[in-house]
Design a protein with these regions (language model features):
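Single conserved hydrophobic/aromatic residue that forms the stacking wall/gate
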Residues: 127-136
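Short active-site oxyanion
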Residues: 36-40
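Catalytic beta/alpha-barrel core
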Residues: 42-45, 130
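Active-site gating/metal-coordination segments in enzymes
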Residues: 2-23, 46-126
């Protein structure tokens, strides 16, 4: 009987948070020790997206990153700023768009601000819709 070792990919590592500044390498080591093979460092605003890309460049064997604007940060959205997000998507470690979406639970940004930001993200996305005329 063969043994299959479980390996995990963490799709939403919020490692740009200031609480990880002093021990990032230790966090990555511990993640690897418990079976995390790779992880995606999440960008939730322009600054975090830049920082996430830099982290992923430092640890390419384990990390990739995302670039995007979280709904809570949508109040920061502008077409000029989003051009910088798009430019980040051309960097090697940046593999995904996001974090993005709509979050009307706490409304740190207005619904209108969230919609503008989300629509900009959608324009960059590949969307698959099966049987779009069929009502669900």
């Amino acid at each position: 009987m063969s043994y299959i070792q479980e390996q995990f990919f963490d799709i939403g590592a919020n490692l740009t948070h200031k609480s990880f500044e002093s021990d990032l390498e230790e966090v990555l080591f511990e993640a690897k020790e418990i079976g995390v093979k790779r992880m995606s460092i999440t960008g939730s605003c322009l600054e975090d997206s830049i920082q996430a890309a830099e982290m992923a460049e430092r640890f390419p064997e384990m990390c990739i990153s995302t670039a995007g604007i979280h709904p809570h940060n949508a109040k920061e959205y502008s077409p000029e700023m989003f051009s910088e997000i798009k430019a980040l998507l051309k960097k090697e470690p940046v593999k995904c768009i996001g974090e993005t979406g709509l979050d009307f639970n706490r409304n740190f940004s207005t619904p209108e601000q969230q919609q503008l930001s989300f629509e900009a993200h959608l324009e960059l996305s590949l969307i698959h819709i099966s049987e779009p005329t069929r009502p669900y």
